[in-house]
Amino acid sequence: MSKESARAGRTAVRGSTTGRPLMAAMDLLGRRWALRILWELRDGPVGARALRDRCDGMSSSVLYDRLRELGDAALIEQTDTDAYALTATGAALGRALKPLDEWAGSWAAVREARAGTTRDGGR
């Protein structure tokens, strides 16, 4: 890989300096509200106002920053109706995250059972 292409890889995601695709993806997806926005778009296009309503507590400025970043990363695009939708790459990410969603459900059940055991004094 040339120095120029390595440099381009490092700047593909604002704030990511590793040049490694997985680390760049984690840097982007780790930003507040980024995954939530992608999750809300999983069933189809959603307008900015509806997205903000679905993501309680997110400010308009953060929403538009994330929409721009996710668009720059080719994960979402704006439709002809000014809604936002996943690109093919964004939809592929959604499919890749499905096992994590399933794991999170199991993990929540374990945590809930553990909390119940703790409240019962271990009984």
Give names to the regions the model predicted.
Residues 79-101:
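Basic, amphipathic "hinge/linker" alpha-helix immediately C-terminal to the N-terminal HTH DNA-binding motif
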Residues 74-79, 123:
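A short, hydrophobic secondary-structure junction motif
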Residues 2-9, 19-21, 94-123:
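Amphipathic alpha-helical dimerization/coiled-coil segments
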Residues 15-64, 68, 73-75, 84-91, ...:
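N-terminal helix-turn-helix DNA-binding core of bacterial DNA-binding proteins
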